[in-house]
């Protein structure tokens, strides 16, 4: 795994969700520190670090309650709701490891380093992708939780890493398992792991 330069970003802990690169989703934010982090991001490049917390009920998670790998994400849209909460639309861009967290009274900043994903060899890549997609199609066929449109979206994805993350996002597995996949920088390992989960 080769590492890229470190950077500082506002930290946004998430309950019960892991965000992958290229994933676009709405989040409803009510915690004051998280709102402050978002507002700070909006004054700059609109980037934040989204990281899952280990225990969803914790209102003020400390460093030990956060996973150490999150996703650098861009705020696409932010809407302040009448009840004081915020609805924000985010798009994940890159996996990142947390090196340090600087918490002040308002919000936390994380020093993070993007994790560059290891590419597959072309032949190995083609086989791994083909096998994983074929098994995922069967999974979608028997699962009531995955919309069939997901398969249509997969056909338009050329990048194996992005394809693996898209499949992972739609798997009915627990938070710890989704986090485990996020922490895998090897695309081959991700595809193989997804295959093992689909076989369960």
Task: Show which residues each predicted segment covers.
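N-terminal low-complexity, acidic/polar interaction/targeting segments
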Residues: 1-198
């Amino acid at each position: 795994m080769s590492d890229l330069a470190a950077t500082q970003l506002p930290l946004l802990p998430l309950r019960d969700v892991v965000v992958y690169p290229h994933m676009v989703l709405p989040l409803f934010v009510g915690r004051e520190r998280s709102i402050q982090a978002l507002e700070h991001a909006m004054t700059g490049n609109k980037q934040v670090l989204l990281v899952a917390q280990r225990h969803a009920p914790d209102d003020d998670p400390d460093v030990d309650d956060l996973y150490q790998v999150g996703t650098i994400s861009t705020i696409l849209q932010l809407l302040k709701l009448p009840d004081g909460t915020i609805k924000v639309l985010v798009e994940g861009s890159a996996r990142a490891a947390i090196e340090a967290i600087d918490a002040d009274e308002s919000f936390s900043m994380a020093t993070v380093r993007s994790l560059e994903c290891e590419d597959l060899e072309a032949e190995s890549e083609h086989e791994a992708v083909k096998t994983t997609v074929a098994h995922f199609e069967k999974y979608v066929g028997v699962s009531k939780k995955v919309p069939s449109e997901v398969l249509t979206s997969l056909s338009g994805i050329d990048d194996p890493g992005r394809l693996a993350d898209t499949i992972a996002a739609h798997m009915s597995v627990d938070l710890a398992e989704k986090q485990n996949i996020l922490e895998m920088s090897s695309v081959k390992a991700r595809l193989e792991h997804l295959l093992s989960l689909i076989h369960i």
